[in-house]
């Protein structure tokens, strides 16, 4: 039962205490409205947390993208910050894409989420609301990281998270419900990380004081309309890049070359190793009569491989650093 609703973000609460905490949090909720979406230079924000997401530097990237494109290709979709910004500008007639828009990712579950937002937004939202309401109603503090029943799961929010994580790893992966769980886990796990091991998704609970917003109905409807013509493809970069033709534009945001041994570099069980970076760089150099833009970390392997190309340094905030999440790093964008 929903008794309280935030007027700004439309998030719903069944308990007055959680509703009050939400209203009084230090960082107020700022949610896109229909009027915001009509403004010039409005960029739709991503609905997922994602390691290496480009929201904070989107303006540095978007100015390097051509205003007239044959086919648009995004080879490492992830959280979709750049794709959503490009589509926002296309909607404002500031970028012209003559033919098709392709978005690729090696994570098939992520691709399914985007596809379900395209075609099944109502049912997706119902599932999200169902699980978020159940989570929000839990008040206990007894932690069970291996619950075997819904009663054990409801002993605490943390227990419920692990119950959902197990369900996510064991259920049919092509369903709308699985995509809803993907989105739920993304906002309740540790800092939005996506990481898989031999037994599936394995990121721990995020310990958030306030029940997070998964996605508002306004944003879901707007994004569904925005991405309606995008072709989402589950594919590795080596296969995706073969689809690029003369006159096309390619944006690449691969797992970054590690700055050190502790850097987070991949979200699938296979990771993204040094040989894959070298193979990617080799394939990029084969792009002739094709415009491209790549984001990466500013390390020797990147700068040495792309000496002949244009580049620009960007200061960005680190997304995952448990000791100092507010620290910054230097990234680089490479383009031709």
For each feature predicted by the language model, list its residue ranges.
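Conserved proline-anchored active-site loop of SAM-dependent methyltransferases
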Residues: 61, 72-86, 103-108, 114, ...
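C-terminal recognition-helix end and immediately following basic linker
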Residues: 1-36
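Mobile active-site "lid"/loop adjacent to the S-adenosyl-L-methionine
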Residues: 196-210, 256-277
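S-adenosyl-L-methionine
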Residues: 35-73, 81-82
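Long, positively charged, glycine-interspersed low-complexity recognition regions
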Residues: 257-258, 267-336
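Class I S-adenosyl-L-methionine-dependent methyltransferase module
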Residues: 92-228
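A mid-sequence, solvent-exposed acidic-amphipathic segment
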Residues: 218-246, 250-251
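Conserved SAM-binding loop of SAM-dependent methyltransferases across substrates and taxa
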Residues: 81-97
